Amino acid sequence: MNKLRSSAITQGVQRSPNRSMLRAVGFSDEDFTKPIIGVANGFSTITPCNMGLNKLALKAEESIREAGGMPQMFGTITVSDGISMGTEGMKYSLVSREVIADSIETACNAQSMDGVLAIGGCDKNMPGAMIAIARMNIPSIFIYGGTIKPGKLNGEDLTVVSAFEAVGQLTSGKINEKRLIEVEKNCIPGAGSCGGMFTANTMSAVIEVLGLSLPYSSTMAAEDYEKEVSAEKSAEILVDAIRKDIRPLTLMTKESFENAITVIMAIGGSTNAVLHILAIANTAGIDINIDDFERIRQKVPVICDLKPSGKYVTVDLHKAGGIPQVMKILLNTGLIHGNCRNIEGKTVVESLKDIPVKPPENQDVIRDIDNPLYKKGHLAILKGNLASEGCVAKISGIKNPVLKGPARIFESEEDCLKSILNNDIKAGNVVVIRNEGPVGGPGMREMLAPTSAIVGQGLGEKVALITDGRFSGGTYGLVVGHIAPEAAVGGNIALIKEGDLITVDATNQLIEVELSDEELEMRRINWEKPSKKYKKGVLSKYSRIVSTSSLGAVTDLEE
């Protein structure tokens, strides 16, 4: 084992005052030569996603001790996207990714920790931890809190998206208020992250593919005992990784990021994965850009039938073989790199050697490669005069990913939702929500409430919604997010007017407004940059330093 980083605070006569503080928190003489390992605990009763994390943190803490390390636990924040959705509070969601990253980096570096075990549940916990891990490059492992089991109502599987869609169904007269309340009371049965292949489960899968969490751990149910066993094993492996000096940046390679993109295409993952993978790769110094997603999409089919657009939830994927089974199918067809390593030091080929090349029979959650749900990936990167830097379209679950229609312009999510619930949006409309980008929001809110209301009203196939904001992992329909440049910095989305004809064509990767360059420049002359919405506090700070979404909306981009 190399010299411990923590020796800076534990060794030598001059560190006697430092050791005195450590003795007060439980260190004894023999502990000062052991690796000090941070346990970044995202436990919170704010959200069901994180309410089960403390038991995992305590299991991991004890396992670190038994393996010969010294754990030091500290807290990280979380924001509940599901609770803040559709409110001003949602502006803090993406911001929380940076706060989580900053807090983990700050605690670990300030205390000269030798490694970190991060534990998270809700959406931004995962990328926040990964950004911190990439910044520090100390031996690290991530423990996912686990997915929630499906809610049940009259034999039907429910998720939190069921509740959002019920609002649209109520306003369009498809259900009554009694049914709405029944869905509300039954869709979230306990602890765990939202149960479809939404953002949290997508990002936990990304971490597993990158090799920084254990095989199968990204699809386990939060309330199952195997999750506790996995937490204990994760701690043991981290202590061993410190001894072997296995560091994150040896695992975070161009090839491993390409593997992660390939897997999220195959499983039907969230649009947010584009933003987060770009951010993590940027921090790791890996050349991954938005065009890599389209390049990989063109050759990778969707082989998992998962909500929001599909039939099953993540616990069903786990029963069918989890991410390792998906990876083995992709490896066998040459779609992922087999030489990437994980935190245990094993290559992809070594880790998957005992897994069959065909998915299990008597299940249809995971399909074979020659019988996909879709022949190409579901996250299309569109470009055109509305998004010269690119944007992300989610096209799973829709029959025709092409729509041309008149623009309906909204300057905020709230205004748009009000119009939808008043039945003002008609088939053929292209709904535009702008000034919701990283700078303009600020914070790039997710538009789950409007999209769910559109789907609930039966317009999911007939209306396109485009925005410089984001979409929840629970969103489906013809939706286009992350439009860059955003409206607040003068992107062309700021210049369009009510009734302008917009084409959204995911087949040809095109998003355009039918205006000449000359007309757009004429409109730009009269455009005024919007004033800052926040003068103080974290949102004000964020809006001043955040990058464009096409670079991951990071806050520490090198100038």
UniProtKB/Swiss-Prot annotation:
Keywords: 2Fe-2S, Amino-acid biosynthesis, Branched-chain amino acid biosynthesis, Iron, Iron-sulfur, Lyase, Magnesium, Metal-binding
Cofactor(s) required, per the database record: [2Fe-2S] cluster; Mg(2+)
The reaction(s) this protein catalyses: (2R)-2,3-dihydroxy-3-methylbutanoate = 3-methyl-2-oxobutanoate + H2O; (2R,3R)-2,3-dihydroxy-3-methylpentanoate = (S)-3-methyl-2-oxopentanoate + H2O
Cofactor: binding details: Binds 1 [2Fe-2S] cluster per subunit. This cluster acts as a Lewis acid cofactor.
Positions bearing N6-carboxylysine: K124
UniProt-listed Enzyme Commission number(s): 4.2.1.9
Residues that hold [2Fe-2S] cluster according to the record: C49, C122, C194
Pfam family for this entry, one: ILV_EDD_C
Residues binding Mg(2+), per UniProt: D81, D123, K124, E446
Active site: S472 (proton acceptor)
Pathway where this protein functions: Amino-acid biosynthesis; L-isoleucine biosynthesis; L-isoleucine from 2-oxobutanoate: step 3/4; Amino-acid biosynthesis; L-valine biosynthesis; L-valine from pyruvate: step 3/4
Single GO term (MF): 2 iron, 2 sulfur cluster binding
GO biological process: isoleucine biosynthetic process; L-valine biosynthetic process
SUPFAM superfamilies registered for this protein in UniProt: IlvD/EDD N-terminal domain-like, LeuD/IlvD-like
Primary role: Functions in the biosynthesis of branched-chain amino acids. Catalyzes the dehydration of (2R,3R)-2,3-dihydroxy-3-methylpentanoate (2,3-dihydroxy-3-methylvalerate) into 2-oxo-3-methylpentanoate (2-oxo-3-methylvalerate) and of (2R)-2,3-dihydroxy-3-methylbutanoate (2,3-dihydroxyisovalerate) into 2-oxo-3-methylbutanoate (2-oxoisovalerate), the penultimate precursor to L-isoleucine and L-valine, respectively.
Family the entry assigns: Belongs to the IlvD/Edd family.
The protein's assembly and partners: Homodimer.
Protein name, entry field: Dihydroxy-acid dehydratase
Organism of provenance: Prochlorococcus marinus subsp. pastoris (strain CCMP1986 / NIES-2087 / MED4)
Gene this chain is encoded by: ilvD
